[in-house]
Amino acid sequence: MFSVLVADDEKAIRESIKDYLEAKGYSVKTATDGESALELFYENSFDLVILDVMMPKVDGFDACRAVRRASNLPVLFLTAKGQEADFLKGFECGCDDYVVKPFPLSVLYEKCNSLIKRYKGIDSANWLKVSGVALDLSCKRAYVG
């Protein structure tokens, strides 16, 4: 099971991402601002961090920089800021992908899978997916969702 940290100050977005990813077999912890996201990041082990850019206390850009100083963990920005300058600033901070709101949850899920697989070095040839069940043939584990 993959573990994801989702930080967004909008409750509806946090909850919809959490519910969707958990239904797909992920473990998800959420934060309402960048400061609490960094606390969770330092206290837990995650496979991916999803950050909103505009959050109270510590914004997503600063949170991404802090994550990047401590880890090479994939970071995905999820934000309403969709101008070219925002994209460039996000990538300069060290993010691995950038999704503009509104977004389909199915696309976010596939981006999460892609980033985590690349980070963990998971070869898709070692995976078998059938009817909502994924088998990791390399370690003989099954994931439902």
Label for each model-derived stretch:
Residues 44-50:
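Active-site beta3 strand of CheY-like receiver
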Residues 3, 113-145:
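Short, Lys/Arg-enriched segments at the junction into DNA-binding effector domains
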Residues 8, 52, 79:
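Active-site residues of response regulator receiver
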Residues 33-36, 59-62:
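Acidic catalytic/metal-coordinating carboxylates
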Residues 15-23:
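Charged docking surfaces used in two-component/phosphorelay signaling
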Residues 14, 56, 83, 101:
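The feature encodes the CheY-like receiver
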